[in-house]
Amino acid sequence: MISSEIKPKLPRWKTLLRRKQRVIAVFSYRFDAHLVPDLLANIDPFVDGWVAFDDRASTGVFSSEVGRRRCLLEAARQAGADWILAVDPDERFEVAVAAEMSDLTRMKGRIAWGFNFRELYAPLSYRIDGIWGSKIRHCLFRAFDPAERTDTGLHDLWYPRNAGFRELRCGLNLYHLKMIDPARRGARRDLYSFLDPDRRDQAIGYDYLADETGVQLEPIPADRPYHPPHVDDGGLWMFDLRDKAGAA
């Protein structure tokens, strides 16, 4: 089920010099529904509204990512989005995004902005060794006709690969809360290994998600916090494959 909340457009006299670009956030939720209120508080300062897909009625291990994204992209376009911000309930943007959003969305043409994807291993520290220090999430992009998107893989981009999108980096941080709890790291590894046993969608596989060999952490800089602060509940936030094994 799709729900949305779109802020009223500014009066025309306030946008005579330059029309404000409308940024609509899109996300879906299921096992992480309880994280949505804090997500909305996090993104409210820099979006013009949001569209959400309530996936809690699903019964399988993992519902159709392609189908959910198609619905969200179309709903955002119908809501008048110039730009789309794709996010998950367990992600938080640094507060500086609010001051930078206007400049980011001023760029012409098809652009996908990449954020430094910081995998938190504690509420205030993220991992930086190896692959962990170089992750980029291109999640702010120009709105487009969802019919252009034909990708079907588990980890596909939100925007079409061969449609002229320029991938740029904004240097801002996007913090991922899911990896804070060690149990979730293992559960995430197991879930993706179950969904992609032949590694067709990710050649390196998923064991690295729970491998702490050589772990190096870096504290979130004092001038780059996210808001609101996160208090971890220790929940799994995803399908528990142990339940599936028990039922079998």
Model regions and ranges:
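Catalytic-site signature of metal-activated, phosphate-bearing donor transferases
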Residues: 2-8, 70, 95-248
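A short beta-strand-loop structural module common to alpha/beta enzyme folds
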Residues: 49-58
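A short, glycine-/small-residue-rich helix N-cap motif at loop->alpha-helix starts
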Residues: 59-69
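Short beta-strand-to-loop acidic/aromatic patch adjacent to the donor-nucleotide binding site
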Residues: 81-94
